[in-house]
Amino acid sequence: MLTLARQQQRQNIRWLLCLSVLMLLALLLSLCAGEQWISPGDWFSPRGELFVWQIRLPRTLAVLLVGAALAISGAVMQALFENPLAEPGLLGVSNGAGVGLIAAVLLGQGQLPNWALGLCAIAGALIITLILLRFARRHLSTSRLLLAGVALGIICSALMTWAIYFSTSVDLRQLMYWMMGGFGGVDWRQSWLMLALIPMLLWICCQSRPMNMLALGEISARQLGLPLWFWRNVLVAATGWMVGVSVALAGAIGFIGLVIPHILRLCGLTDHRALLPGCALAGASALLLADIVARLALAAAELPIGVVTATLGAPVFIWLLLKAGR
C-alpha cells in the first residue's frame, strides 16, 4: 500500500513537472510570436521593448492568470457539487459578471474607462455570489444549490439578451466581442486586476485537504469532521471572485473550467494536492496556446479566444473520454 502511494506521488510530480515545462514553452512562444517574430535575443532592443515588454508581456500574464483561475474554479466546483460537468458558468457567476459589465457599457454609453468596466463586472459576479450564499445559509443540499445557480445563470443570460436587443450598433459590437472573449485590449493598466487574482489562486491551491474531503461526498465529509457549511460558503465566494475578475479581464471564456480538471483526472491526478496546481498550470498553458492561435490564425484580425478554446478543446476532450472508456 505504501509502495502504491509512493508511485502515485511520483507520478503526480512527473505530471506537474511536465505541465510546468509546457507552460514555460507556451510563455516563451507567446512572447516571441505575433505579426513580427521577435526572438529572445532581440527582447531588449528598442523594437523588443515596445512589442514584448509593453504589448505582449501584460497580455501573456493576463492569459496565464485567467486560464489558471478558470481551471481551478472548475476543479473546485466539480468537487463542491460532486458533478464532473460543473464549471464556472454553471452557477451563474460568469453571467452575473456579464450583466454587470453590460450594464456599465449601456449606462455609460461606451465612455467609461476600462477600470470602471472591470469593477462593474466584479460587482456583478459578487452579487450573484452573495445570492448563492444566501441560499447556502438556508442549508440547502448541494444539488438544490446547483439548481439555484443554474436558474440564476438563465436569468442573467436573459437580461444580457434583452440588453443586446435594445442596444445601439456601437454598443452591440462591443458587447458581442466581449461575449466571445478576448485579450486584445489588455495592457499594464489592467495590472490591478491581475494582482487581484494571485492571492486567491495561491490560497485555493493550499486547500487540498478540505477539497479531498469534499470530493468524497457530503456524507463522508461530515463524518470526517469537515464543517461543510463553512467551506461551501468560502469556496463559492472564492470562485465568484476569481470568475468576476477573469470576466473583467477577458470576457466570457468557456470550456477551460469544464475540461481541464476532467482531463487531468483522466490522466491520474485525483489527489487535490496535485490536481489544484496541475489545473493552474494546465489551464494557463491551454489558454495561452489558444491565445497564440487566436492572434496568428488571421493576418488582419484576431479570432475570439472563446471560439478557439471550444473548437480546439472539444475534439480532444471527446478523444480522451473514448480512450478512457476502452
From Swiss-Prot:
Residues 1-10, 82-92, 139-141, 207-228, 268-274, 325-326 are cytoplasmic. Keywords: Cell inner membrane, Cell membrane, Membrane, Transmembrane, Transmembrane helix, Transport. The chain crosses the membrane at residues 11-35, 57-81, 93-107, 114-138, 142-166, 191-206, 229-249, 258-267, 275-296, 305-324. It is found in: Cell inner membrane. It is a multi-pass membrane protein. Its main location: membrane. One of its GO terms (cellular component) is plasma membrane. Residues 36-56, 108-113, 167-190, 250-257, 297-304 are periplasmic. GO terms for biological process: cobalamin transport. It holds the Pfam family FecCD. One of its GO terms (molecular function) is vitamin transmembrane transporter activity. InterPro entries: ABC_BtuC-like, ABC_transptr_BtuC, ABC_transptr_permease_BtuC. The complex is composed of two ATP-binding proteins (BtuD), two transmembrane proteins (BtuC) and a solute-binding protein (BtuF). Part of the ABC transporter complex BtuCDF involved in vitamin B12 import. Involved in the translocation of the substrate across the membrane. Belongs to the binding-protein-dependent transport system permease family. FecCD subfamily. This is Vitamin B12 import system permease protein BtuC. It comes from Escherichia coli O157:H7. The lineage of its organism: Bacteria, Pseudomonadati, Pseudomonadota, Gammaproteobacteria, Enterobacterales. The gene is btuC.
